């Protein structure tokens, strides 16, 4: 189907003081990802697949400083030392691969349609935003391979971020033995307008990184991996049937939860389990409604029947967000964000 395309690495063109913009939306996995084969190179054991959603958005400015002393991350208008340290790890990888010296300052804002939740893939949106801004800064906005480079480097911030660079449906090609430059996502160009979605944000306090580490210790992990490769081939053979994708998203959620329960980790809460029970009860008389979740209790409801989704949501008292699958993954900066970003970099220059 021509999913995989390759582009050569362009020549870096760093410019001291240059400021560039990037943005990203959160991906919601159809074919889930958990566990790294090579954590240093961010190579997962399996390919994965997701849709891009509009439940939040991340916007980022990146400034290159040829003679700076350190990388700096400002997140939601405050200096974030923890994220600055984790950014250094990703940026060291970028500098090593591209042969670029110097440091970077990021000004990042997240805009959410909810207050607090776990499993809404905010990290993937941030990864796509900062990687897009970084690639634009060093290689230029119009470089032919921009999206593929942004996808490649986003994985060093968040594995799922490699897919958040692309609109609609995308797949992250990853498996043991793949070369790091080829371990990135590719857009799958199919019509998704019939897919209707809504999100029920739910909160839980646990670390996704811990889930990655624990998952590979499960006796179920190898069977889970083998099942994924087999089902991935089936989905491709059936030309990415929309019904198949929704069915697989639900199946994968249940498989992932089972996998992590086998190492003593329960992802769902009383609230999310109650919601799942109501979904299952509703569709006994109204088939065609599906649900899924990633490494968190937030539940995505999906269907190819818009009226069916409306009917279910009318019965619900839990907070939910009606959403859309994003068709354009590169929105421009809002005027308000431009003004705040400008003020930030001006104050930064005055303090130096």
Task: Please annotate each region the language model reported.
Residues 5, 100-190:
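Gly/Ser-rich oxyanion-binding loop with an adjacent helix/lid
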Residues 1-118, 135-143, 328-352:
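ATP-binding N-lobe of GHMP and related small-molecule kinases
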Residues 79-82, 119-122, 220, 224:
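Short alpha-helix boundary/capping segments
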Residues 27-31, 59, 88, 128-135, ...:
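Predominant activation on well-ordered alpha-helical scaffold segments within soluble catalytic domains
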Residues 2-39, 43, 187-352:
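C-terminal nucleotide
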Residues 63-68, 175-176, 203-205, 304-306:
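Short loop segments at secondary-structure junctions
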Residues 28-32, 50-51, 58-63, 161-173, ...:
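Short beta-strand scaffold segments in enzyme catalytic cores
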Residues 82-90, 126, 146, 271, ...:
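Short amphipathic alpha-helical segments
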């Amino acid at each position: 189907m021509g999913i995989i395309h390759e582009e050569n690495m362009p020549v870096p063109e760093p410019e001291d003081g240059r400021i560039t913009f990037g943005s990203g939306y959160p991906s919601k996995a159809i074919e889930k990802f958990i566990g790294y084969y090579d954590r240093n190179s961010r190579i997962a054991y399996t390919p994965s697949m997701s849709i891009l959603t509009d439940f939040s958005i991340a916007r980022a400015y990146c400034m290159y400083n040829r003679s700076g002393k350190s990388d700096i991350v400002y997140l939601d208008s405050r200096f974030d030392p923890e994220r600055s340290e984790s950014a250094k790890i990703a940026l060291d990888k970028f500098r090593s691969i591209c042969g670029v010296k110097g440091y970077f300052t990021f000004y990042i804002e997240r805009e959410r349609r909810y207050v607090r939740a776990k499993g809404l893939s905010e990290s993937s949106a941030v990864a796509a935003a900062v990687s897009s801004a970084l690639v634009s800064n060093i290689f230029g906005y119009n470089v032919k391979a921009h999206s593929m480079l942004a996808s490649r480097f986003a994985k060093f911030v968040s594995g799922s971020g490699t897919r958040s660079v692309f609109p609609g449906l995308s797949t992250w090609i990853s498996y043991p033995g793949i070369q790091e430059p080829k371990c990135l996502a590719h857009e799958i160009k199919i019509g998704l307008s019939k897919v209707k979605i809504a999100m029920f944000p739910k909160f839980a306090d646990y670390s996704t990184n811990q889930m990655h580490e624990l998952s590979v210790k499960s006796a179920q992990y190898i069977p889970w991996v083998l099942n994924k490769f087999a089902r991935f081939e089936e989905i491709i053979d059936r030309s990415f049937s929309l019904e198949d994708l929704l069915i697989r998203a639900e199946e994968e959620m249940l498989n992932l939860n089972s996998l992590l329960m086998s190492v003593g980790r329960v992802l769902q809460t009383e609230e999310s389990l109650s919601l799942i029970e109501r979904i299952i009860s509703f569709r006994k008389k109204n088939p065609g409604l599906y649900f899924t979740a990633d490494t968190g209790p937030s539940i995505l409801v999906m269907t190819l029947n818009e009226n069916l989704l409306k009917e279910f949501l009318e019965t619900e008292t839990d907070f939910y967000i009606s959403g859309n699958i994003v068709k354009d993954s590169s929105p421009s900066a809002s005027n308000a964000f431009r003004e705040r970003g400008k003020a930030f970099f001006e104050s930064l220059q005055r303090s130096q």
